[in-house]
Swiss-Prot record:
Designated gene of the protein: polC
Name of the protein: DNA polymerase III PolC-type
Compartments in which it is found: Cytoplasm
Gene Ontology MF term list: 3'-5' exonuclease activity; DNA binding; DNA-directed DNA polymerase activity
SUPFAM superfamilies assigned: Nucleic acid-binding proteins, Ribonuclease H-like
UniProt source species: Listeria monocytogenes serotype 4b (strain F2365)
Length: 1444
């Protein structure tokens, strides 16, 4: 070795010393001959690049240590980087993957989404030198290619790797509703299996058995590593702020995950919380025993963990690397009382944005504590009743079904103590009081002022301060402006009141919110020994609400400002009284003018009429169903409150509650109930009067009322106790049981934070944000007894235990949902369906039906009629028939095309019989029932041998069992795709068929999603100036998800109530999202809750029928006559030949852009690989593209490996049953195998054995095992039929196709690019593509439209500008070889304005741009856009008047 070479080696060793790695002996084989070849220093940019000559590529850990060490050592001098030059560039997949996180981690700072995508996977390595990663969609692929691919490859290059190439493959997942329903069912099934597995494991443990393989059964508490001593110091998670060497923590596990690493080891990752914070715990398995033990660590366990806390670069947060994990006993609240209470006031997550614990968790808690019953009382809704009933059955609890209603009085009086006094001639004593609080019982008047008014003029004044005998609170001083100095030494209350009573005499008393002021005056009169005022009274607040209901609010300062009345200092009695006087005179005159009210005793004549319910202030009451009649009445009240009396919240007028009181029990509810308010503000006598209306009285623990003290509505805890004691006395006096309830909003005290976050998210709109939230967790009997100890032990037990159970015993056991299906009845439906089916069959197949036809008809009709489904077929027939008569085709969804009766009754176009020829003339037929033909549409053209007429070709070979099950008893789910334009008509037609009172939109409940909850948590963190660890955020997010946020309606679901029942037998009714102007009412229950009880029609809106209708209108071609095997159309699915363009022209090797089901990049890739040429192969493609694990890693590999061809692979679920029957399997077993495979359950040993015995290929069996979800063939066939028809127009009538596509399917346009031609369009497409994942949704939608526009331009057609006199409002118009865009294609110009322009145009030419703006209702921005595009050439700016 030369001296120079030795020097280079010495420099390298010196470098290692400088960066602190001189003693790293582990990697000696990589570093001992390493040299610094050169150092490139860039003084200007302050960068140093070390070129290191090494024997072989460094391990990733060594490279990382050196990189970090160099950056740290030279940070004050320059930025550093390495360029490794290895002698041996040998690489493998392990090395590639070891470097992966180092290389892609920085990407997360530039694009968190792409960073996360890449960090969560490992690339695969393919020879010679390329790596492959997975992406979900085209935009992710484009973003990586354009922004990050080069950086990744260069980073590997700097580490010494040979030049790599990078490849991406697309993942796919069906987004259909059917898939979502399947996924939900699968999840529930998995959870059930998991629960069963736990039971089995526990049983084995009890019996001392051991299962083979999998998780090692626990024989005691879970433990990995050493035992952690009981007395070892435990650190709170909330006290950990930095890395720590070796500490112990403990907490509840709320998430677990086990990852299998490529090294063969397992990584256990779980999250724990001790409710001060949360943390991620990681642990690597040391051996197979550890890996097996990991399986036993479950969510819900409490554990103690010892390990080191460190910063994890992957999650960018502190985590703990665990050495020891011990299961410990959890923290549990126990109910140790011998006699248990029952909770009668409890909220579930259906109390909108207000309660967080699931029904299941609350009911389980009640059962664990030994309670025998529990009530549900959500705010105004019964939406948790179905779940509560199920939970009650599960845990053996009696469920009391109730609501916490918003009760209102029927109209609030404007006048009190009615007297026949002429209003214009009267003298008014207008007064105002300022007080120390809101309670006339516990607070005092500190200022009393009044003015006398006659004929609108003030004729006298009264003003006095009153000494309360104690210092004023800060709140009182701030609100009123009255200070201690102002009241100190003033006259006492009795003196002032006596003077005021004499001064006011018999005049009409007037106050703004008179119930408050009169309450204080009369209570004060009584206290000092004076009689209550008998004067006539006018309340200006209620009079203003009556006269001006449209005002946003009716506060005194708002009204005085509105009517230009001077209010010098609000909340000072003297100024308020004077302003109120002038306001009162204005209102009296308006009452005369607007309603001809002349006398005081006429002011209440309109009370309760019209919108009076909006003016009433709601108070809470709990309403329970005692009997079945009561349950139905409760449903009626909920409906009424949502439909007839909704204003901000659903309201129930007292009169309506009285009418429907049979079978109901009514409680007084919480602090917002009228009894508590009466006791707090008016005293014992008023409270006793209120109590008469109720069946029992509620009191709640003092902490539940804490906000009243904080807001100074109640003076202190002692005053609160006094109120509660008095309420108990009211119960004793009136004979009404007093029951202690918890107003429960969550299960445990630690759950309070979730509610805080939800309430905080609503800001000032929620009054609960005005004070600290109370503690409203589910309390044990012991906790409740302790809360009411101030009443004495005996009385506390009476209200907590005895009376609660007394009320429970009043209630009958009720079931809020039905057990059976109740379908509507149509007389003669069975005969009509049978007759229609046979009539159509004879019309098509002749008088003597082929045996295969008659057998199929009889088989289906037996099931359909026998199980009462004929009416469902008849209804669907009527809907489809009306649409067809009105000129719109209907596409079928789901498996309805599996039913030949559905075909014969014109519900679906799909014919499920085996492929066959059919003569339209002599009715001859020829069937192929041996599986040799996939679809009748694929049969070669042939003439009838009997009469020479060309045969029709039919039959898709789909078994009936896939629709109604093997026994034919499954409720038919007939989903129909109507034109989006026609869907409202189809919906309205159901009202004609059944009557408006029997059809409702299927209701849905929108809950807080994880993403939304994340936003709530982050905003809470920001507003509270907190820093919350990532794992804690995850816990808080989980605690906030699933809470009801709004309601809605299924896009196409119509619920039909049979006319021999009414809707209240099943559900209450409401408007979607509380939109009282909605055309449709919805079921109050989520439709899934009553899916098995009533008929649901799926009348969906779809673009395909709309497109077909427009194409028919343009061409005059009946779509039913379009051939399904046109050669040029079939070429479209494998090449661009039929379009007359090259693949490079349109950036696609197929011609299917814009063809439904076949236009996405994912499906186009499938077409390129499979090259389908027949209808049945297109059906295969449709099935493969919608399934899960049917194409990727399954059929794709089979075709690629030439194991089989496209027609042979499993595409749709029905293929399995048909193929297995053809192979010789018994039909019921074939059906079971199909059902098992389509649900992702795989095959049992017995199934496999039967398949192998019948010579089913091994590859077919293995393919079945991989499948997670499958598409029905009937659905695929219906979609493909529509697609082929549309493709026919694309090939043979291109401008009709493009005009239709842009009119029906496109929403976003770039007219400038489209009008300027192909290069402009391509340039805009490139701009969007260059943005990758950063492109907005609008830009992504535009890209799809531009792809079609580019194709149209490539075929030699072009776009014109929007034409002021030719353009349509909302349709593209064909003009020669071009399209004229409609007005609504202009950015920000809506369809209504577009129609206005056309309407104005029909009334005469536009004289100027000004004329267009005025008559067309067009904004200046739109005028400018149209002018810039040259659409307004020759049009002057303004109208010009010529004199000559």
């Amino acid at each position: 070795m030369t001296a120079k070479e030795e020097e280079k080696q010495e420099r390298f060793q010196l470098l290692m010393t400088q960066i602190g790695l001189q003693d790293v002996t582990t990697y000696e084989e990589f570093t001992k001959d390493a040299k610094i070849e050169k150092l490139v220093a860039d003084k200007k940019n302050k960068t140093w690049q070390f070129h290191l000559h090494v024997p072989q590529i460094f391990p990733a850990a060594l490279f990382h240590m050196m990189d970090v060490g160099m950056k740290r050592a030279f940070s004050q001098i320059a930025e550093t980087e390495m360029q490794i030059v290895p002698e041996n560039q040998t690489i493998d997949e392990t090395l590639i993957q070891d470097y992966w996180n180092l290389i892609v981690e920085p990407i997360g700072k530039q694009s968190p989404m792409i960073g996360k995508l890449l960090m969560e996977q490992k690339p695969t390595f393919k020879e010679p030198h390329f790596i492959e990663v997975a992406v979900h969609n085209d935009m992710e692929e484009a973003t990586i290619q354009q922004r990050f691919q080069t950086k990744i490859i260069e980073s590997y290059g700097k580490a010494g790797f040979p030049r790599l190439a990078m490849k991406m493959h697309l993942l796919d997942q069906s987004e259909t509703e059917e898939y979502k329903a399947f996924a939900l069912a699968k999840q529930e099934e998995d959870q059930k299996k998991a629960a069963e597995a736990v039971q089995v494991m526990q049983k084995r443990q009890a019996e001392g058995q051991s299962g083979g393989g999998g998780a090692a059964p626990l024989t005691g508490p879970f433990q990995i590593g050493y035992k952690i001593k009981d007395d070892e110091e435990v650190k709170r998670l909330g006290d950990i702020y930095d890395e720590e060497r070796r500490i112990t923590v403990q907490g509840l596990i709320f998430a677990t995950e086990i990852r299998e690493l490529r090294s063969g080891r397992s990584l256990l990752q779980f999250k724990i919380t001790d409710y001060t914070s949360s943390m991620i715990i990681k642990m690597f398995s040391r051996d197979n025993e550890d890996a097996a033990m990991f399986q036993n660590l479950k969510k819900g366990m409490w554990v103690k963990v010892r390990g080191s806390v460190q910063n994890d670069t992957f999650v960018r947060d502190l985590i703990m690397m665990a050495q020891d994990v011990n299961e410990i006993a959890g923290v549990k609240r126990l109910d140790t009382a011998e006699e248990k209470r029952a909770e009668l006031h409890l909220h579930s997550p259906m109390s909108q944005m207000d309660a967080t614990s699931s029904v299941d968790s609350l009911f389980k808690q009640a059962a664990d504590w030994g309670h025998k019953a529990i009530a549900i009382t959500d705010h105004s809704v019964a939406q948790s009743f179905p779940e509560a009933y199920g939970a009650g059955q599960k845990y053996g609890l009696k469920v009391i079904f109730g609501i916490e209603a918003n009760l209102i009085d029927d109209g609030v009086p404007i006048a009190y103590n009615d007297q026949h006094i002429a209003l214009e001639d009267a003298t008014y004593c207008v007064f105002d009081v300022e007080t120390t609080g809101l309670s006339a019982v516990y607070d005092t008047i500190i200022e009393l002022a009044g003015v006398k008014m006659k004929n609108g003029e003030i004729i006298d004044k009264f003003e006095a301060f009153i000494d309360p005998g104690h210092p004023l609170s800060a709140t009182t001083i701030n609100l009123t402006g009255i200070t201690d100095d102002m009241v100190k030494g003033s006259d006492p209350i009795d003196v002032v009141l006596k003077r005021f009573k004499e001064w006011s005499g018999d005049d009409i008393l007037v106050a703004h919110n008179a119930s408050f002021d009169m309450g204080f005056i009369n209570t004060a009169y009584e206290k000092v020994g004076l009689e209550k005022a008998e004067n006539a009274v006018v309340d200006t607040l209620e009079l203003a609400r009556f006269l001006y209901p449209h005002f946003k609010n009716h506060r005194l300062n708002t009204l005085t400002k509105k009517f230009n009345i001077i209010l010098e200092q609000h909340h000072r009695a003297v100024f308020d009284a004077e302003a109120t006087a002038y306001l009162a005179w204005k209102l009296i005159k308006d009452a005369k003018e607007m309603h001809n009210i002349d006398f005081h005793d006429s002011l209440n004549d309109y009370m309760g009429e019209g919108d009076a319910y909006k003016r009433a202030r709601p108070f809470h009451a709990t309403i329970y169903a005692q009997t079945a009649v009561g349950l139905k009445n409760l449903f009626k009240l909920i409906t009424m409150s949502n439909i007839n009396y909704f204003y901000r919240v659903p309201r129930i007028p007292r009169s309506q509650l009285k009418k429907l009181r049979e079978g109901l029990i009514i409680g007084t509810a919480c602090s917002q109930g009228e009894l508590f308010e009466a006791m707090m503000q008016k005293g014992m006598q008023a409270a006793e009067k209120v109590a008469e209306f109720y069946d029992f009285i509620e009191v709640q623990p003092k902490p539940v009322y804490a906000p009243l003290i904080e807001r100074e509505l109640v003076r202190d805890e002692k005053a609160l106790e006094e109120i509660l004691k008095n309420i108990v006395r009211v119960g004793e006096k009136t004979g009404k049981p007093v029951v202690a309830t918890g107003n429960v909003h969550y299960k445990d005290p630690v759950d309070k934070i979730y509610r805080k976050i939800l309430i905080h998210s609503q800001g000032g709109a929620n009054p609960l944000n005005r004070a600290e939230l109370p503690d409203v967790h589910f309390r044990t009997t012991d906790e409740m007894l302790k809360e009411f100890a101030f009443l004495g032990e005996e009385k506390a037990k009476e209200i907590v235990v005895t009376n609660a159970n007394l009320v429970v015993d009043w209630m009958e056991d009720l079931k809020p949902i039905k057990d059976e299906l109740y379908t509507p009845k149509i007389d003669g439906a069975e005969d009509e369906v049978r007759n229609m089916s046979y009539a159509m069959a004879h019309q098509l197949y002749g008088e003597k039906l082929p045996e295969i036809v008659e057998a199929r008809l009889e088989k289906e009709l037996k099931s359909i009629i026998g199980h009462g489904f004929a009416v469902i077929y008849l209804i669907s027939h009527k809907l489809v028939k009306k649409s067809l008569v009105d000129g719109y085709l209907v596409g079928s969804r789901g498996s309805v095309g599996s039913s030949f009766v559905a075909t014969m009754t014109e519900i679906t176009e799909v014919n499920p019989l085996p492929p066959h020829y059919l003569c339209p003339n002599c009715k001859d037929s020829e069937f192929f029932d041996d599986g040799s033909v996939g679809s009748g549409f694929d049969l070669p053209d042939k003439d009838c041998p009997h009469c020479g007429t060309p045969y029709q070709k039919e039959g898709q070979d789909i078994p009936f069992e896939t629709f109604l099950g093997f026994k034919g008893d499954k409720v038919p789910d007939i989903d129909l795709n109507f034109s989006g334009d026609y869907q409202p008509v189809a919906h309205a037609y159901t009202k004609e068929i059944f009557g408006e009172d029997y059809v409702f939109r299927a209701g849905t409940i929108g809950t807080v999603a994880e993403k939304t909850a994340f936003g709530y948590v982050r905003n809470y963190e920001r507003d509270m100036n907190m820093t919350i660890r990532g794992a804690e955020i995850d816990r808080l997010v989980a605690g906030c998800t699933g809470v009801k946020r709004t309601t809605g309606q299924h896009p196409g679901g119509i619920i039909v109530i049979p006319d021999y029942m009414d809707v209240y037998d099943f559900t209450p009714v409401q408007f979607p999202a509380d939109a009282t102007d909605s055309e449709w009412k919805t079921t109050h229950f989520d439709f899934h809750s009553i899916h098995d009880n009533v008929l649901k029609l799926d009348i969906l809106g779809h673009d395909d029928p709309t497109a077909i209708r427009m194409l028919q209108d343009l061409s005059g071609i009946d779509p039913k006559t379009i051939p399904t095997d046109d050669p040029d159309v079939m070429k479209l699915f494998g090449s661009t030949e039929s379009l007359g363009v090259k693949p490079a022209d349109i950036d696609s090797k197929t011609g299917t852009l814009g063809i439904p089901e076949f236009g996405t990049r994912f499906v186009r890739q499938m077409l390129e690989q499979t090259k389908p040429t027949t209808f049945s192969e297109l059906v295969q493609i449709s099935g493969l593209s919608h399934g899960t694990d049917v194409w990727l890693g399954n059929a794709e590999e089979l075709i690629k490996n030439k194991t089989c061809e496209l027609p042979d692979v499993i595409g749709c679920r029905d293929d399995i049953m048909v193929f297995l029957i053809y192979q010789g399997l018994e039909s019921s077993l074939a059906f079971k195998i199909m059902e098992s495979v389509r649900k992702g359950k795989g095959l049992t040993e017995e199934m496999e054995e039967a398949m192998m015995a019948n010579k089913v290929p091994l590859w077919y069996i293995e393919s079945c095992k991989k499948i997670k979800y499958m598409f029905p063939k009937a659905h695929a066939a219906a979609y493909v039929l529509m697609a082929v028809r549309i493709a026919y127009f694309k090939v043979h009538y291109p401008l009709y196709f493009y005009a239709t596509y842009f009119t029906v399917r496109a929403d976003d346009f770039d007219l400038t690019s489209m009008v300027n031609g192909k290069e402009a369009v391509k340039a805009t497409m490139k701009e969007v593509n260059d943005k990758g994942m950063e492109a907005s949704t609008k830009e992504k939608n535009l890209l799809t439209v531009l792809e079609i526009a580019n194709e149209m331009l490539a075929r030699g057609f072009h776009f014109q500008k929007v034409d002021l006199y030719k353009s349509s409002a909302d349709e593209f118009i064909i003009d020669g070889d071009s399209l004229i865009p409609p007005f609504n294609a202009i950015p920000s110009l809506g369809t209504n304005v577009a129609k206005q322009i056309v309407a104005a145009r029909e009334n005469g030419e536009f004289l100027s741009k000004e004329d267009l703006q005025q008559r067309g209702k067009v904004s200046k921005t739109i005028i400018q856009y149209m002018d810039d595009q040259g659409c307004l050439e020759g049009l002057p700016d303004q109208n010009q008047l010529s004199l000559f």
